[in-house]
Amino acid sequence: MTDCDLCGKGIPTVIPVRTYPPLLRFAYPEGVWKGLCETCLDSAQKTYLEVNRNHTSCRRGKCSLCGSKTGVFSVELQIPDFSKGIVRKDVDVCYRCLKLVDEAYIRYKREQIEQDHEQGRIHGHEHVHPH
């Protein structure tokens, strides 16, 4: 089990997102991997799309993924809680990390499609759905 780096939910596998923490840039010039659950990945990618579409202004803060003190955007998370069900919480993420989350989201969805496509070939033929 591993924990999501944004919401802390414990899950068997996380989706890797490369980040570039400013304090570690000399030790890790290629970046550091953070792990997100699918819900947090979806929320952060949704925020990225909204920022690009609406040109949302940022505010100064500390990014929850890379730790840089820069302009950040609010990402709404849905954190599971045994007593309250789902708790909504906002975390701050910088534009650079949002862009990296978007790349990870695209890569993750592409892998899911390829996996589904491969499962369709289990019996040696593709399942064709008429449209």
From Swiss-Prot:
Entry keyword DNA repair: no
Ranges annotated as spanning the membrane: none
Annotated GO MF terms: 2 iron, 2 sulfur cluster binding; metal ion binding; Methanosarcina-phenazine hydrogenase activity; reduced coenzyme F420 dehydrogenase activity
Record field: pH dependence: Optimum pH is 8.5.
A Pfam family hit: FpoO
Cofactor: how bound: Binds 1 [2Fe-2S] cluster.
Protein name as it appears in the record: F(420)H(2) dehydrogenase subunit O
Species assigned in the record: Methanosarcina mazei (strain ATCC BAA-159 / DSM 3647 / Goe1 / Go1 / JCM 11833 / OCM 88)
Gene name in the database record: fpoO
